[in-house]
């Protein structure tokens, strides 16, 4: 096996040699030192991935049955090209052919998918020592959030950190957040004027950062947000990429350098805000103060570095959900003008004909808007795939998954399986008023995860999105441009819309 593996690696190096040589000539202008550095990085990356692949070859116990394996004639890369081009189609076709559990190889790693509610239960009910999250996500999140938080610490410590954050995401804070988000939204859209065409995903991504920073980080951090800091957040967010997931973090890639620089500069902003708050006699009831007052079970308080890392993680983890969901919902409403008008009229019915400032209690009663968000999350969940690393053999549907497999669930596939959802591809917010096969399935709808792994920011995300879209519907009418509805951009790690430009017109008062 080692000899065959060595030949495979040699073949990869030979196959990539001519392409790499041509690319290096263009990038380096023929500079010998630069070419050598790039060649070394390329070779080390292949060796790194190859070692991961070989390390995952584990024998099953006697008599155990492996999941159906989708063969690929392409060594090492496996199904990476087909999957990368159209991942949902790939998974749905595999489900039809092989059933709810199957395996395949990409970039030297073996992935086992659990599709449908029954199979997905294995992942969502698992213990971290069996299906491990850090083994999958640490190299992606640690350079972004920092060391000592999230997936860089043992799971019991991470659970304590999540509990601290969750204690700050409470109804008392949400009631404060509604007016903050409404004010930020009105101020942001002042520059849009009476009518026009705008990239709504870019706009909402910026607005989500502004509102989340104000609500979650406190006024000290929000006061420092400007175009430069917004770009730092964008560079930091760029760390969530396929390259960061697949390649070692020490490679001198431009996106890695931007990510690391942004991390240092944003941390400095947080350090100053934390010190200012610690020195202040004023006690402000917000999440920053919650973390400054929090202690671990052993009585140890959080360090400034831990507080900063947790705040960065809280913002960026939620930013993806809220910005992507908000943008997609805008296009669903623009495509269905009748539904859009119903959502606008609901504002008047619930809040009053003169549309006074929003309150948290009113927000809870906007049931149609709530169902629109829920249906958007069904068809366009921000996270396409949730993963864990198998550390122990796992049995599901009569198959045994060996240690070393990356075990995956796809919310996107689960939330549009024809066995679970009637008219599964239609955007129909009223489906939640009716009986659905999915309503009896525990893991048919999982945009925020489930079980031990459910997202702690779900309630804040709903408050944020509902407040932003309530304000936007009061300000504007939205239309598609020449009937264009965006396709999904699968080159990113979230379901972003392609060319997300929308037409708007201010409502007459």
UniProtKB/Swiss-Prot annotation:
Its main location: endoplasmic reticulum. Keywords: Cholesterol biosynthesis, Cholesterol metabolism, Endoplasmic reticulum, Heme, Iron, Lipid biosynthesis, Lipid metabolism, Membrane, Metal-binding, Microsome, Monooxygenase, Oxidoreductase, Steroid biosynthesis, Steroid metabolism, Sterol biosynthesis, Sterol metabolism, Transmembrane, Transmembrane helix, Ubl conjugation. GO terms for biological process: cholesterol biosynthetic process. Its cofactor is heme. GO terms for cellular component: endoplasmic reticulum membrane. PROSITE patterns: CYTOCHROME_P450. It comes from the Eukaryota. Pathway: Steroid biosynthesis; zymosterol biosynthesis; zymosterol from lanosterol: step 1/6. Its EC number is 1.14.14.154. Inhibited by azalanstat. Inhibited by azole antifungal agents ketoconazole, itraconazole and fluconazole. It is found in: Endoplasmic reticulum membrane; Microsome membrane. It catalyses: a 14alpha-methyl steroid + 3 reduced [NADPH--hemoprotein reductase] + 3 O2 = a Delta(14) steroid + formate + 3 oxidized [NADPH--hemoprotein reductase] + 4 H2O + 4 H(+); lanosterol + 3 reduced [NADPH--hemoprotein reductase] + 3 O2 = 4,4-dimethyl-5alpha-cholesta-8,14,24-trien-3beta-ol + formate + 3 oxidized [NADPH--hemoprotein reductase] + 4 H2O + 4 H(+); 24,25-dihydrolanosterol + 3 reduced [NADPH--hemoprotein reductase] + 3 O2 = 4,4-dimethyl-8,14-cholestadien-3beta-ol + formate + 3 oxidized [NADPH--hemoprotein reductase] + 4 H2O + 4 H(+); a 14alpha-methyl steroid + reduced [NADPH--hemoprotein reductase] + O2 = a 14alpha-hydroxymethyl steroid + oxidized [NADPH--hemoprotein reductase] + H2O + H(+). The chain crosses the membrane at residues 30-50. Heme binds at residue 455. CDD domains: CYP51-like. Pfam families: p450. GO terms for molecular function: heme binding; iron ion binding; sterol 14-demethylase activity. Belongs to the cytochrome P450 family. Sterol 14alpha-demethylase that plays a critical role in the cholesterol biosynthesis pathway, being cholesterol the major sterol component in mammalian membranes as well as a precursor for bile acid and steroid hormone synthesis. This is Lanosterol 14-alpha demethylase. It comes from Pongo abelii. The gene is CYP51A1.
